[in-house]
């Protein structure tokens, strides 16, 4: 592997309201356009009152990017105003482009998104919209309710994707309500649509463990038909992270194999197929200076080895060893590099993208084009 070039899809350095960029995603449309979506805000933490969900478009394979587009006004949900936290796209067919957002209750806008006393989250909703003209216009946003986790805060963990059986897949995790005091059991969940993203259900709970949080799941469709799922993993008993864990489904996401230790330390992105039948994943290791690396597995995900350093931040930002959940959330709020993801461009090269910048509230949507 080698890096061919690096770039920035969007920098908010001259636009204060878009100064902090995070939650990056790239959707490649059938007409060759790239939609690079992300959260942009005046500040990263602690509240959500300045959040915007925007995207930029490239028509030349990530050589250049349009000015930012903000496609949706924050919706009213259950009679309450919201802010839009994240935006993702997936193309079902050329005439059915689906946008999926997370909207957050804005009536509590002065409060932190995460409640340190209860470990609950503000009300976080999933909504979808459809475009039949390639993103020129959009239908009204409609809320996704899941029977298994009705009315719970449901943060998305990455972009939706199309499974081999034609269903559209949402990836998310469950959280408890802001003031709920009961013990929180984290779940990573997939939900499915068989009608092009208009109705949702058939939820599959991928992880369910009282003591270990398999969170920030990154699920993806592999060429051979399997769905890969990989997790940033936190052991509540130890009060700190453990190795990344990995699993696969061979039945279109209806069930998953037992989780395995990937032997990698950090926060992963999505898994994609390598050109030689291997699997490739980007991940960020924050043990010292944050470093985005590429790892490869030649045995179907049983073991992984590092192959390339995509980006090194150049200085350590880890303040101390974590002691529990509140330390973890506090640390996440200060990150100014992270969320690495990967996609294969139409010319066969890889695009690894992530957010990075000089400070917590001043980060860009960055990427590297890599020859495998």
Q: Where on the chain are the PLM-derived regions?
A:
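Asp-box/BNR beta-propeller blade signature and adjacent active/binding-site loops
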Residues: 1-372
């Amino acid at each position: 592997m080698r890096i061919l070039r690096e770039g920035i899809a969007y920098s908010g350095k001259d636009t204060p309201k878009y100064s902090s960029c995070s939650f990056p995603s790239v959707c490649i449309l059938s007409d060759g356009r790239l939609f690079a979506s992300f959260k942009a805000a005046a500040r990263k933490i602690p509240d959500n009152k300045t959040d915007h969900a925007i995207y930029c478009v490239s028509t030349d394979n990530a050589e250049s990017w349009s000015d930012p587009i903000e496609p949706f006004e924050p919706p009213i949900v259950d009679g309450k105003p919201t802010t839009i936290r994240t935006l993702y796209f997936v193309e079902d067919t050329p005439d059915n482009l689906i946008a999926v957002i997370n909207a957050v209750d804005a009536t509590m806008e002065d409060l932190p998104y995460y409640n340190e006393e209860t470990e609950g989250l503000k009300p976080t909703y999933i909504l979808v919209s459809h475009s039949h003209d390639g993103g020129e216009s959009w239908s009204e946003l409609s809320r996704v309710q899941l029977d298994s986790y009705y009315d719970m805060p449901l943060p998305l963990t990455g972009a939706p994707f199309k499974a081999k059986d034609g269903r559209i897949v949402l990836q998310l995790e469950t959280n408890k309500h802001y003031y709920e005091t009961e013990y929180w059991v984290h779940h990573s969940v997939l939900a499915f649509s068989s009608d092009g993203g208009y109705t949702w259900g058939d939820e599959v709970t991928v992880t369910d463990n009282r003591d270990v949080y398999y969170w920030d799941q990154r699920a993806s469709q592999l060429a051979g038909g399997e769905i890969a799922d990989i997790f940033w993993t936190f052991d509540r008993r130890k009060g700190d992270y453990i190795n990344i864990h990995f699993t696969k489904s061979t039945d279109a996401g209806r069930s998953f194999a037992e989780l395995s230790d990937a032997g990698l330390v950090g926060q992963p992105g999505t898994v994609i197929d390598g050109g030689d039948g291997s699997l490739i994943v980007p991940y960020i290791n924050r043990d010292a200076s944050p470093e985005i690396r590429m790892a490869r597995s030649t045995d179907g995900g049983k073991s992984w080895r590092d192959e390339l350093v995509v980006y090194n931040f150049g200085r350590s930002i880890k303040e101390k060893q974590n002691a529990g959940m509140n330390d973890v959330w506090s640390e996440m709020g200060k990150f100014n590099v992270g969320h690495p993801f990967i996609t294969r461009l139409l010319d066969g090269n890889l695009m690894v993208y992530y957010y990075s910048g000089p400070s917590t509230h001043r980060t860009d949507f960055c990427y590297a084009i890599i020859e495998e």
